[in-house]
Amino acid sequence: MNINKQSPIPIYYQIMEQLKTQIKNGELQPDMPLPSEREYAEQFGISRMTVRQALSNLVNEGLLYRLKGRGTFVSKPKMEQALQGLTSFTEDMKSRGMTPGSRLIDYQLIDSTEELAAILGCGHPSSIHKITRVRLANDIPMAIESSHIPFELAGELNESHFQSSIYDHIERYNSIPISRAKQELEPSAATTEEANILGIQKGAPVLLIKRTTYLQNGTAFEHAKSVYRGDRYTFVHYMDRLS
């Protein structure tokens, strides 16, 4: 890297842009360790604080990650998720050539709240499956998913359902295909619990997704809240110009 101390462009920003270029062109590969802050500072004759600012910004953008006591490393490329199509997590990972998996955090059969009953269009009170899982890709935690599904639309559920695609089970159980979903996305920061589960730092960027999914007959069968790692996922929406 070359740093121009006479440039009006801040030094930390020059470091960021050059590291981005090295990551993009493959000079820096995923999981490759970077020199330490001290080494960068000595190499360019700048302060460690300036180096730390550049690296911290790239960590926040998901391009780098830190391991306590070991240093800073290059992140794996983010996976793009198109917002137009409706697929399950299992289907999505398989389409990428990855091995999907799930780890059950909690399961309860609960009584519906008024809010859930209104969203799902079920009676109140009625029995609701509440399933909280960590969704995995090649054994790497990608998201925390908490799903609420009316008992009458799923029947009894067991460990085998939690380890695979619940969407497949829902379609078989009801003999009706899944057709559409309403989805809301908003940025958030990982809580201590979320960070521990996902293997990221507390306060790291995450994507909070709320989704209500419907069968072809218009029946809402699931309301889910998911927390996706911001360093591994990016959501893309393609738009056509209206005539």
UniProtKB/Swiss-Prot annotation:
Residues bound to alpha-D-glucosamine 6-phosphate: F89, T90, R133, V134, R135, E145, S165, I166, Y167, E222, Y228
Keyword Glycoprotein assigned: no
SUPFAM superfamilies, per the entry: Chorismate lyase-like, Winged helix' DNA-binding domain
Phenotype of null mutants: Deletion of the gene results in the modulation of the expression of many important genes, probably indirectly due to an excess of the crucial molecules acetate, ammonia, and fructose-6-phosphate, resulting from complete hydrolysis of GlcNAc. Disruption of the gene induces a slight but consistent increase in MapB activity. Deletion of the gene improves the growth rate on N-acetylglucosamine.
InterPro entries noted in UniProt: Bact_HTH_transcr_reg, Chorismate_lyase_/UTRA_dom_sf, Tscrpt_reg_HTH_GntR, UTRA, WH-like_DNA-bd_sf, WH_DNA-bd_sf
Keyword DNA-binding: yes
Residue ranges annotated for the HTH gntR-type domain, each copy included: 9-77
GO BP annotations, alphabetical order: negative regulation of DNA-templated transcription
Inducing or repressing factors: Expression is increased by growth on N-acetylglucosamine.
Entry note about domains: The N-terminal region contains a canonical wHTH DNA-binding domain. It is linked via a 21 residue-long linker to the C-terminal domain, which binds the effector molecule.
Subunit structure of this chain's protein: Homodimer. Forms dimers via the C-terminal effector-binding domain. At high concentrations, probably forms polymers along the DNA.
Role summary: Main transcriptional repressor of genes involved in N-acetylglucosamine (GlcNAc) transport and utilization. Represses the expression of the nagAB and nagP operons by binding directly within their upstream regions. Binds to the DNA consensus sequence 5'-ATTGGTATAGACAACT-3'. Also acts as a weak repressor of mapB expression.
Protein name: HTH-type transcriptional repressor NagR
Native source organism of the sequence: Bacillus subtilis (strain 168)
